[in-house]
Amino acid sequence: MLEDASVDYEYVRLTWDHQWQAKKHELLEQGAIDPTMPYITIGGKHYFKTLPVMRIIAKKLGKYNGENEEEEHLLDAYSDSINDWITKWATAVFGGNEEVLKTYKETHRVNAHKLLNRMLSLNKGPYVFGEKVNR
């Protein structure tokens, strides 16, 4: 989103073990309620979690958001559906249970693809809103 909007930013990649744990502790000491990766700092304020970070960027840039409540709802529904899919994928892949993985591959993945294709087919073009990334 930031690159597409030509916003200068510093990308910092942290290792999960030592670097993130130290940074998380620091953020908690600064008063952050639930620090997670990814997060973004804007004007000295920290914003956490994938979807809320994307929403704050969209609001601050005045881009990547719907033009009305229906479009905003569609974006939220699309985002939540992707999050649901990722949760099921992670549980299946990292859960270590062959039955869960089989169910994911045969059911959840297929259903997620159908749902996302249905959502993307509401408007002509490759994006949620059709031919443009945003309206």
Regions found by a protein language model. Give the residues of each.
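Short, intrinsically disordered, charge-balanced linker/junction segments flanking boundaries
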Residues: 126-135
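GST-like domain detector, emphasizing the conserved glutathione-binding G-site
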Residues: 1-113, 122, 128
